[in-house]
Amino acid sequence: MPKIDLFNQNGEKVGDLQLADSVFGVEVNTYAMHQVVKALLANKRQGTQSAKTRAEVSGGGIKPWRQKGTGRARQGSIRAPQWIHGGIVFAPKPRDYRMSIPKSMKKVAMKSALTSKVNEKLMVVVDDIKLETPKTKEVVKMLNSFDAKKTLIITNNAEENVYKSARNIEGVQIIPVNNINVYDLLKYDKVVITKDAVSKIEEVYA
């Protein structure tokens, strides 16, 4: 069963935390993570791109000049792709990019992402993060104590003061545990997570 250091928000070690082997100690499945990230990014695409092909552009029904005798290259239509305002070759059309991923694969990918962060010592567990008033300086101080720059902060509840304090820090994103996804876990170099959020993850994914 993986064991990880437990810190307070001042960066001081206050104990150890046993992590569930079934969530934070699984065999990392890179294929599952790749598929889930690919699906997440694909599902964000609008798919509204559109351009006209040669057949759809207006005009160009008449030959611009006769075939021979002008000294110029032969042309059949002013809407051919080589002309300005001509049609687009293989023009993009609106399409649905959505991918569906089995729930079991999503679960495997999430566990793999969490395990990889623990294995690479890129996860920091904090007993709690509390601020009486929004203070960006306090969050920066906490992150500096963990040598965390490009960081994902995961809390059990959307603590308003903490959220307001972290939202303007470059390279830092703060989300409630209910909104975690594989892409964000892999995108950020380090994960700072509260003890309660860890318990919530184990409750859902164990």
Curated annotation (Swiss-Prot):
Q: Which SUPFAM superfamilies match?
A: Ribosomal protein L4
Residue segments, region Disordered: 47-76
One Pfam assignment: Ribosomal_L4
User: Which GO biological-process labels does this protein carry?
Assistant: translation
UniProt cross-references to InterPro entries, sorted A to Z = Ribosomal_uL4 (IPR002136), Ribosomal_uL4-like (IPR013005), Ribosomal_uL4_dom_sf (IPR023574)
| Gene Ontology molecular function | rRNA binding; structural constituent of ribosome
- What UniProt keywords apply to this chain's record, in alphabetical order? Ribonucleoprotein, Ribosomal protein, RNA-binding, rRNA-binding
Lineage: superkingdom: Bacteria
Read off the PANTHER family from this record.
50S RIBOSOMAL PROTEIN L4 (PTHR10746), LARGE RIBOSOMAL SUBUNIT PROTEIN UL4M (PTHR10746:SF6)
Q: What does this protein do?
A: One of the primary rRNA binding proteins, this protein initially binds near the 5'-end of the 23S rRNA. It is important during the early stages of 50S assembly. It makes multiple contacts with different domains of the 23S rRNA in the assembled 50S subunit and ribosome.
Q: Subunit arrangement? A: Part of the 50S ribosomal subunit.
Q: Which family does it belong to?
A: Belongs to the universal ribosomal protein uL4 family.
Its protein name is Large ribosomal subunit protein uL4
Tell me what organism the protein belongs to. Clostridium botulinum (strain Okra / Type B1)
Please name the gene that encodes this protein. rplD
